[in-house]
Every structure is written in C-alpha cells, then in structure tokens.
Amino acid sequence: MTGVSVISIDREEQPNGPRYIADLQGLEEDFPMKLTDYKALTFDCYGTLIDWESGMMEGLKPLTSKLGTALSRNAVLEAHARHESAQQEQTPGKRYRDLLPIVYKRLAEEWGLGVTWAECVQYGKSVRDWPAFSDTAAALQYLKKYYKLVILSNVDNESFSFSNQKLGVSFDAIYTAEDVGSYKPAPANFKYMLDKLKSLGVTQSEVLHTAESMFHDHKPANAIGLASCWIYRRHNDQGFGATMNPGEMPKYDFRFTSMAELAKAHQEQLRA
C-alpha cells in the first residue's frame, strides 16, 4: 500500500498514548497517491464525524451516576467497547438501536447495578442526541465539491437519520449495518459498499476510506487493499476508547487529527 503520510509504521508507547513514526525511505520511488487522486471518500460516521464517545458518556450518566466509585472516562468507554463488540458478533442482524439496550444491561451487570429495561431502551434511543464534532459539517461541505461522499456505518437507518441532520451535506450513498446485516469489521460490509459503489461509477482504487477506528475500519481496509485515511480524533488521549484494540496496528495512507486538517491538506494540494 502506498501513501502520502506513511509507508510503514512502528509503534512506541508514550505517556500520552501511542506514538507512530513514519519511515519515509523510498517515498518518492513509490509514487504515492495524493488526496486529489481519489474520486470518493467513504466515511465511518461514529467516532469520525459524530462524537460518539461524548454522546455515550452523556447517555450512560443515569447508570454511571449510581457507581459508588467513579470510573475514568476511558474505563467506561473500554467496557462499552467490549460488550458492544461481543453483542455485534453474537447478533449481527440486530439493529443498533436494539443492540445498545443490551450493552447498557451488560454494563449494569458488570458494575453490580440494578436497571429497568425501560432505562436500557432509553439508552438505545440516545444515538439521535450524539453531537457532531465541531469541524465536521464545514469540512464535509468543502469536500463535497471535489468528491463523492459515502457513509459506511455500524448503525441502523433510523438512528443515522438523526445524525445525518447534523452533518451538513447530502451524501451520495449511505450504507448501514442494518442494510448489510452485519457489523464492521466484517468483510461483508466493505464488499457490500464496494459493490454498490460500482453503480456510481467508482472503483476500489478510486476510494479513500476515512475513519477513526483502527479496529472497525483500518484493519479490514488493510485486508482487502483499500486505501485509508486515519482521522485520529483521540490523539490527545490514551488507548482506543469506545473501539476495541486492533492488535497489530494497521497501516494507513494518510493521517490527520481532525476533518478540518483533512480539508486543509486537500486545499494545499490543489495549490501545489
């Protein structure tokens, strides 16, 4: 895989989280792709465009407020990731808004707390309230001028419809876990997307998959040779938050800490 930001990656643990060091040897010989070479940007939504971690923490307050000893934000998110990932694997056809109540119940059980099913269901509805990152809408509006914009998300259609109102653009295509019948990182989700994109006149080599999650997005993208752009939203934090640890770190072709940085880099390449 070639790229602008990195060719190969070594991981070193640092006090503020993982540090990634690019080995740029041979960069020119590899004729790396530029952002301007792609025809479509395919986005993970939650964690990349929507601040799902803040939304989760707000939605979990009725539960976490009952804890005798407060847990750190990362401890809560990591527990959520464990239960969510396990449930998605066990029931891949269950809609996300119906899966989240089970996650809420599992968290309550892990923490020894009593909850009603009504509380669990309410958490499943909280996706509609999860906020967009402050830079998302403006960046998407800029990128829309140059790319087909596509969503590949691990949610259900109804939940995404609420989030979509906060994103500021009309997407050329939206593919959800409900449509596919499975959750990322399942290969089926990426195959579904790439097959559908052919009808829009877009081939895999023209796609840049843009996402925060190494586990849900970059690892499966690596497996099929799909170019990817890492939006490293957690660059000031430790660990993987609301996503599972991917194990060996996947590679990526571009890295930015925000959508605003991605849009700025595209502008700079146009001027070059």
Identify what each model region corresponds to.
Residues 53-54, 137, 186-187:
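Conserved strand-to-helix beginnings and helix N-cap segments that scaffold or border functional pockets
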